[in-house]
Swiss-Prot record:
Paired cysteines (S-S): C6-C26, C10-C22
Domain comment as written in the entry: The cysteine framework is XIV (C-C-C-C).
Tissue: Expressed by the venom duct.
Family from the record: Belongs to the conotoxin L superfamily.
Keyword terms: Disulfide bond, Neurotoxin, Secreted, Toxin
The name this protein goes by in its record: Conotoxin as14a
Subcellular localization, as worded in the UniProt entry: Secreted
Cellular component aspect of the GO annotation: extracellular region
Summary of the function given for this chain in its UniProt record: In vivo, intracranial injection, elicits scratching and grooming activity in mice.
GO molecular-function terms, A-Z: toxin activity
Length: 27
C-alpha cells in the first residue's frame, strides 16, 4: 500500500529520519 512506499521514500529522502519517525509521519 501507500504507507510502505511513504516510509521507503521518507527513509531515502536524505532527511535523516529513522523508520519510527517515518512510520509515524506516514500513518
Amino acid at each position: 500500500g501507500g504507507v510502505g512506499r511513504c516510509i521507503y521514500n521518507c527513509m531515502n529522502s536524505g532527511g535523516g529520519l529513522n523508520f519510527i519517525q517515518c512510520k509515524t509521519m506516514c500513518y
